[in-house]
Amino acid sequence: SHRQSQHLAYSLDRGRSWTKFAGNPVLDLGGGGFRDPKVFWHAGTERWIMLVSMADEGWLRLFQSADLKSWQPLSEFRQDVPGGSVWECPDLLELGIEGESGTAWLLKWDVFRGHPGGGSGALGIVGRFYGTHFNATQPPEWLDGGMDFYAAIAFGVMPPGDPRRVWLGWMNSHHYGQHTPTHPWR
């Protein structure tokens, strides 16, 4: 695949316009299949965490930064999954545990093939995130029963104190998306 790297852009007007950071790329491993960064603030380490797909190899990498400009490697996450497929669109969410006062972390990623309904889908695994690495405490599970749930990312748009997370994902599959009617949109 072609070379992929991570870049930074910033806005000074609440998202109306964007400026590319002069020091781009902020993270470049020198190869392809390095995509779909999910960046979030981790209060426990007071660092930004970047979860990135090593898509073609089928695993994930974690990096940390104090300033979003300089990134240091933290750890890797690998897991045997059905279909042994391309991994994309990772996400890592801290969620409350129903009926308990603690939290757990959900690590989610999408695979190109292997879903029991046919085609691609989202896998999730519950565990603990320690600020540097993720340890699974349960086996991976499919997060949706259909083959049309892909590339979902959680957005941090809920009001403070609201524990819900909102996922926005594709209603499509790589296996037939190019064959669906698109006129006049494409």
Language-model features: locations:
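Beta-rich carbohydrate-recognition and catalytic domains
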Residues: 1-37, 41-89, 94-145, 159-164, ...
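Catalytic and ligand-binding motifs that coordinate phosphates/metal ions
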Residues: 146-157
